[in-house]
Swiss-Prot record:
Known catalytic reactions: [glutamine synthetase]-O(4)-(5'-adenylyl)-L-tyrosine + phosphate = [glutamine synthetase]-L-tyrosine + ADP; [glutamine synthetase]-L-tyrosine + ATP = [glutamine synthetase]-O(4)-(5'-adenylyl)-L-tyrosine + diphosphate
Chain's gene name: glnE
GO MF, any single term: ATP binding
Name of the molecule in the record: Bifunctional glutamine synthetase adenylyltransferase/adenylyl-removing enzyme
Keywords for this protein: ATP-binding, Magnesium, Multifunctional enzyme, Nucleotide-binding, Nucleotidyltransferase, Transferase
Native source organism of the sequence: Salmonella paratyphi C (strain RKS4594)
Adenylyl removase: annotated segments: 1-440
Length: 947
């Protein structure tokens, strides 16, 4: 065994002072001295439990002792009588075995592959032991869940990721998916429960038993977000629901995740075999599938962007050449050829590497280097985490922990360890790039073209200097360009850039100037880009991105030239520069029905318990998607209707995620309202009004929302801190508002306006569905019924959605006096015009002035309220374009008039979108849109003025 290094020998004196009673420096073995000096986790544990140290001193841990874990845990749980004592014993057992593993790992008593196996078996043993105890307890309370034939149904648990692969790291969280075989009901209990309810309750108790922090700590952080539909989906799914999802909706990244899926406590019974057989075709295709390479490349790009966003330097998992890249290399071959080559279907990485070598899919030397690098990195990761039982993959910055790792990795000192690490990661990166990398590089022609611009950049020409490369610009433009460059250089002198930053900037600027100054609008474009550059000069990562990826630089210039809104967004949030790397996604926004799934995948990389990071991630995702929508808008690939569709679907995905976060936080605090025990769903709905309800969001639109619940009176929550059920929903709505409006470094998510709720700002923030119906029928004003025309549920379970739709239909199909309605709608519009109309007499306010967008909206709303009692189909849609279509189809409005109003409406909205992209107000010269305005005014007179 390697003697302790000098810094660690000095630290040992600190350890001696903390030794438990009965142990002295002379009474301890050299092995104990080494472990307790290396790991604060081990030291703290034996201080609390001195008998563990005595046990380890008398008999060292063995390589195959994982075979005894299940028996040891069974003994530990023999006296458990309730959930609290179960949680205590699970935590005690986990800590005791983890100390044994840390001891064996630190002293290299067991090889590194076996350590990974022990960590994985420990987790599996604890999961299965907790599940089995809780299953029996739940059966005693509610009966045994059975299928219609009376066959008892088990809870099956899929371990995902490193747990599934038998490669768990020391302080890992665990990714799980819960499933049960067939629908049915419980039998033999005090009352019958549907199987879905039984297994949901069992799943919730199991997560609590493992995940909830107590005075004894926790067992594992449990992450359930890999299940179908993520946090918004059921906690536990039947086999049939799982099969439907993966056949019809399973995404590429879910396929990759499922490669490592393994049943916990698999005893190879009929249910287990059925589940494995069901999932296999989804994971391994019968044909050779080369689409995998691009998908994995995209995933790696997402991770690289995450590393930049979160400033994850020295990260041995996610960094270039890290553990994740080795996993990607192996998965490429599994997913391309696994359907044809059974040897590639292993869940574990090292056996799969052996299969890759046997099939000659990679050179022997590459496979050997990957194996050595993987074991090196995994040992380093485990040692790093075992110091404090902390989930981290970032190398330490302090001398003590660096000395610990150097000793644990058998290096002479920290620089030697870093040198070995650098070599291993370089080998991994080389193989990765050869296989799925796509680095760009400058061509010789581009270098030659940019060379003359070095003089312009580096020689700091004055505005009256002449240079051949600027000769094509007009005098004023040339002066502006030189002034902008000079001012930018002066600004740089005030910034702590550092030598590497200046070097990258000197490489970048000639290329940037060559591209910008070839444009007619060079001065304007440069004036938009220099603030962005000034914002990132101290963040070398982003300068390198623009320097190393010429395509990204070209897209930056094009987008900034086209839109000051995009330029200012990029300047404010430089992390958006990552989106410029892939033109395939930049100009092709996410499919309208895929925003929820994209967001779910994005949030999976953020710890569920880290609220601050979750808030940042939501805002960053929204900004990236807005950029892609705007880029497609500028490129002309999205018409105005589609722009609003995308902005609306994006907002709905955000609402879904925010409600989920708020719900999780509230349930953790109070439990959920007890009436939900008897029904599916959450008893909560979010209704979108205005532009959101009408599928007409713009780039900077706020969200008009109201919140509904269906909680009866006198219902309490079922958590340890009981509160009234209606109070729960009020706090939930307040939490949602808070999550939307909290300002982080990435800004707010959306401005939310909840004043359209019953009684406006004076009313309750959240309303029961019955109270909402009563208000609409007996108290609401006509303008509130107009608003209801453009309202729809944007989040909610089917029961509440149907209830809201029925109320909306009832209100809109109520017969009204035509003359009274006409007067009320017209007078409301005149009040709005007086209050909001354009104050610039020589300008036309596209939205608020006569003949503008609001007039068209009022015409549509008036006609729906006027005629829906005769033509109920008019209530079907909440957006103006389809309402106009319905009016024509139902004979209310002439088809030619409806078509003309639709064209006018989309034309005016298109102009508003493009004014927003130019950061201009929503008014234009009076001479603009005269034809459209005349047409709208004629229609207004026909419907709302004529007697």
């Amino acid at each position: 065994m390697t003697p302790l290094s000098s810094p660690l020998s000095q630290y040992w004196q600190t350890v001696v002072e903390r030794l438990p009673e009965g142990f002295t420096e002379t009474s301890l073995s050299v092995q104990a001295k080494s472990v307790l000096t290396f790991s604060d986790f081990a030291l703290d544990s034996v201080i609390a439990h001195p008998e563990w140290l005595a046990e380890l001193e008398s008999a060292s841990p063995q390589a195959d002792e994982w075979r005894h874990y299940a028996g040891w845990l069974q003994e530990a749980l023999a006296g458990v009588c309730d959930d609290a004592s179960l949680m205590r014993e699970l935590r005690f057992f986990r800590r005791r075995i983890m100390v044994r593993i840390a001891w064996a790992q630190t002293l290299s008593l067991v090889d590194d592959e076996t350590i990974l196996q022990q960590l994985s078996h420990l987790a599996e043993t604890l999961i299965v032991g907790a599940r089995d105890w809780l299953y029996a307890a739940c059966c005693r309370e509610w009966g045994t869940p059975c299928n219609p034939q009376g066959v008892p149904q088990p809870l099956l648990i899929l371990g995902m990721g490193k747990l599934g692969g038998g490669e768990l790291n020391f302080s890992s969280d665990i990714d799980l998916i819960f499933a049960w075989p067939e629908h049915g009901e419980t039998r033999g209990g005090r009352r019958e429960l549907d199987n879905a309810q039984f297994f949901t309750r069992l799943g919730q108790r199991l997560i609590k038993a493992l995940d909830q922090p107590t005075m004894d700590g926790f067992v594992y952080r449990v992450d359930m977000r890999l299940r179908p539909f993520g946090d918004s989906g059921p906690l536990v799914l039947s086999f049939a629901a799982l099969e439907d999802y993966y056949q019809e909706q399973g995404r590429d990244w879910e396929r990759y995740a499922m490669v490592k899926a393994r049943l916990m406590g698999d005893n190879d019974d009929a249910w287990s075999r059925e589940l494995r057989a069901m999932l296999r075709p989804f994971v391994f295709r019968r044909y050779i599938d080369f689409s995998v390479i691009q998908s994995l490349r995209n995933m790696k790009g997402m991770i690289a962007r995450e590393v930049r966003r979160r400033g994850l330097k020295d990260n041995i998992k996610l960094g270039a050449g890290g553990i994740r890249e080795i996993e990607f290399i192996v998965q490429v071959f599994q997913l391309i050829r696994g359907g044809r080559e059974p040897s590639l279907q292993s869940r574990s990485l090292l056996p799969t590497l052996d299969a890759i070598a046997a099939l000659h899919l990679l050179p022997e030397n590459d496979v050997a280097q990957l194996r050595v690098a993987y074991l090196f990195l995994r040992r380093l990761e485990n040692l790093l985490q075992s110091i404090n039982d902390e989930q981290t993959q970032t190398l330490p910055a302090d001398d003590l922990n660096r000395a610990r790792l150097a000793w644990g990795m058998k290096a002479e000192n920290w620089p030697q360890l870093v040198g070995e690490l650098t070599d291993h990661m370089a080998n991994v990166r080389r193989v990765f790039n050869e296989l799925i990398g796509d680095d760009e590089a400058d061509t010789p022609q581009e270098e030659e073209r940019s060379e003359p611009w070095r003089e312009v950049w580096q020689d700091a020409l004055q505005e009256d200097d002449s240079t051949p490369v600027l000769a094509h610009l007009a005098d004023e433009d040339r002066r502006q360009v030189l002034t902008l460059i000079a001012d930018f250089r002066k600004e740089l002198d005030k910034r702590p850039i550092g030598p590497r930053g200046r070097q990258v900037l000197d490489q970048l600027m000639p290329h940037l100037l060559a591209d910008v100054c070839s444009r007619e609008d060079a001065a304007v474009t440069l004036s938009r880009i220099t603030p962005l550059l000034a914002g990132i000069v101290t963040r070398t990562t982003y300068l390198e991105l623009l320097s190393e990826f010429p395509g990204a630089l070209k897209h930056l210039i094009m987008l900034c030239a086209a839109s000051p809104m995009i330029a200012s967004q990029l300047a404010r949030y430089p992390l958006l520069l990552d989106e410029l790397l892939d033109p395939g996604t930049l100009y092709q926004p996410t499919a309208t029905d895929a925003y929820r799934d994209e967001l779910r995948q994005y949030l999976l990389r953020v710890p569920e318990e880290d609220e601050e990071q979750q808030l940042e991630a939501l805002r960053q995702f929204k900004q990236a998607q807005l950029l892609r929508i705007a880029a497609a808008d500028i490129a002309g690939t999205l018409p105005v209707m589609k722009v609003s569709d995308h902005l609306t679907w994006l907002a709905e995905a955000m609402i879904d995620a925010v409600v989920q976060q708020a719900w999780t936080q509230m349930v953790a605090r109070y439990g959920q309202p007890a009436h939900l025990d008897e029904r599916q769903g959450r008893g909560f709905a979010v209704v979108g009004y205005g532009k959101l309800g009408g599928w007409e969001l713009g780039y900077s639109s706020d969200l008009d929302l109201i919140f509904l619940h269906d909680c009866p009176m006198d219902v309490m929550t079922n958590g340890e801190r009981e509160i009234d059920g209606r109070q729960f929903y009020l706090r939930l709505a307040q939490r949602i508002m808070h999550l939307f409006s909290t300002r982080t470094s990435s800004g707010i998510l959306y401005e939310v306006d909840a004043r359209l709720r019953p009684s406006g700002a004076a009313g309750m923030l959240v309303t029961s569905a019955d109270a909402f119906a009563d208000y609409q029928q007996h108290e609401a004003w006509t303008w509130e019924h107009q608003a209801l025309v453009r309202a729809r549920v944007v989040y909610g379970d089917p029961q509440l959605t149907s209830q809201f739709d029925a109320v909306r239909r009832t209100i809109m199909t109520t017969a009204r006096d035509g003359k009274t309605l006409q007067t009320e709608v017209r007078e409301m519009r005149e009040k709005m015009r007086a209050h909001l109309g354009n104050k610039h007499r020589d300008r036309f306010d596209i939205k608020a002035d006569e003949g503008g967008i609001t007039d068209i909206e009022f015409i549509a709303q008036y006609l729906v309220l006027r005629y829906a009692h005769e033509k109920p189909k008019l209530t079907r849609w909440s957006d103006n374009v389809r309402i106009l279509e319905l009016l024509a189809q139902n004979g209310i409005m002439d088809e030619h008039e409806a078509q003309a109003l639709t064209v006018a409406y989309t034309t005016l909205r298109d102009e508003l979108h493009h004014l927003a992209l130019q950061e201009l107000p929503g008014h234009v010269a009076q001479t603009c849109f005269s034809k459209e305005r005349a047409l709208v005014q004629a229609s207004w007179r026909k419907w709302l003025v004529a007697v």
